[in-house]
């Protein structure tokens, strides 16, 4: 089962807090990673890696550059999960077991 928008935002908020120290309440769909949350490119790569692990998706570098807001990432994850739900579910289960 694919994650809901709210679940993805909550998961991203946890990752962003861990990587940058930004409060989860600041992470909302309309927020820009650079302009609003002041996240640099190195932190963005770390967020992407952890997001890939958590949601069982692969975010190529060329796609990462186009993901400017939290909402962009949510939509991207949902699209990838819809395209390959079995792989996403298996990786999410593995990630949950590792917690």
UniProtKB/Swiss-Prot annotation:
Gene: acpM
NCBIfam families, A to Z: AcpM, PRK00982.1-1, PRK00982.1-2, PRK00982.1-4
Gene Ontology BP, a term: lipid A biosynthetic process
Protein's UniProt name: Meromycolate extension acyl carrier protein
Residues recorded with modification O-(pantetheine 4'-phosphoryl)serine: 41
Lineage per the UniProt record: Bacteria, Bacillati, Actinomycetota, Actinomycetes, Mycobacteriales
Carrier domain: residues covered: 3-81
InterPro entries: ACP (IPR003231), ACP-like_sf (IPR036736), Meromycolate-ACP (IPR053393), PP-bd_ACP (IPR009081)
Chief place of localization: cytoplasm
Subcellular location: Cytoplasm
Family: Belongs to the acyl carrier protein (ACP) family.
Keyword field: Cytoplasm, Fatty acid biosynthesis, Fatty acid metabolism, Isopeptide bond, Lipid biosynthesis, Lipid metabolism, Phosphopantetheine, Phosphoprotein, Ubl conjugation
Superkingdom assignment: Bacteria
Its job: Acyl carrier protein involved in meromycolate extension.
PTM comment text: 4'-phosphopantetheine is transferred from CoA to a specific serine of apo-AcpM.
Keyword Calcium: no
Gene3D superfamilies registered for this protein in UniProt: ACP-like
Record GO cellular component, one term: membrane
Cross-link (Isoglutamyl lysine isopeptide (Lys-Gln) (interchain with Q-Cter in protein Pup)): 79
GO molecular function: acyl binding; acyl carrier activity
Pfam family, any one: PP-binding
